[in-house]
Amino acid sequence: MIQKETNLVVADNSGAKKVRCIHVFGGTGRRYASLGDQVIVSVKAAVPGGVVKKKEVCKAVVVRCVKEQRRKDGSYIRFDENAVVLLNAQGEPRGTRIFGPVARELRDRRYMKIVSLAPEVL
């Protein structure tokens, strides 16, 4: 469960390392985001010379979440960290590589580019 002020790890090579959620998409009453949901983030730590800079505001999609999520078959999926992939205005990843596994829920949400770049889909 990702909400405002949640600190997140960036799982791509866009140049950002740590970000903080500042908005969850889905209406004014929506509080939490989970796997495959879009959020707006502020970059808190970045690599020098990277594509994104510190203090930059951008869109991101949640690819790993600590809070377990139930699947249709009754199983649960959860990860060790909250991670996002930064997106551009067209909804495509800003980086060219994805680090770590991503959830299968991204395929259902039509993030095919992220799924194809990921080393493992759980």
Curated annotation (Swiss-Prot):
This protein's encoding gene: rplN
Pfam families the record matches: Ribosomal_L14
Annotated Gene Ontology cellular component terms: cytosolic large ribosomal subunit
Keywords: Ribonucleoprotein, Ribosomal protein, RNA-binding, rRNA-binding
Function: Binds to 23S rRNA. Forms part of two intersubunit bridges in the 70S ribosome.
SMART domains: Ribosomal_L14 (SM01374)
Family statement drawn from the similarity comment of this UniProt entry: Belongs to the universal ribosomal protein uL14 family.
Protein name as annotated: Large ribosomal subunit protein uL14
This protein's record includes keyword Transmembrane helix: no
GO MF, one annotated term: large ribosomal subunit rRNA binding
GO biological process annotation, one example: translation
Position of the signal peptide: none
Source organism superkingdom: Bacteria
Subunit: Part of the 50S ribosomal subunit. Forms a cluster with proteins L3 and L19. In the 70S ribosome, L14 and L19 interact and together make contacts with the 16S rRNA in bridges B5 and B8.
Entry keyword annotation includes Ribonucleoprotein: yes
